[in-house]
């Protein structure tokens, strides 16, 4: 089985490859078993993302652990996890087609 952090890196690359992200627009997170979330960092191109760049955020305290800052939209992810116990991952992107449809 592929380790979760590597799966997140690969998911970011798939967003870029599918033209759903220019590389820096959007973020990914996965719920951890211990009340935390593993999140992509702020302002880092998915093409440059490594497993070491991911940030662990405690959903209760908001405390972040990692060498980078978490996505500025981490609270959006936290709210999704709070409201939906059945949700274990969030993909938030600003792809050109979805953005055009929203306008």
Task: Identify what each model region corresponds to.
Residues 96-103:
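Class I SAM-dependent methyltransferase SAM-binding "motif I" and its flanking Rossmann-like core
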């Amino acid at each position: 089985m592929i380790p979760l952090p590597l799966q997140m890196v690969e998911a970011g690359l798939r967003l870029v490859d599918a033209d759903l992200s220019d590389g820096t627009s959007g973020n990914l997170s996965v719920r951890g078993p211990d009340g935390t979330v593993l999140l992509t960092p702020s302002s880092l191109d998915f093409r440059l993302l490594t497993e070491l760049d991911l940030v662990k955020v405690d959903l209760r305290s908001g405390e972040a652990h990692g060498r980078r800052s978490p996505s500025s939209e981490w609270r959006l992810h936290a709210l999704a996890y709070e409201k939906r116990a059945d949700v274990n991952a969030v993909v938030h992107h600003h792809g050109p087609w979805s953005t055009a449809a929203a306008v």
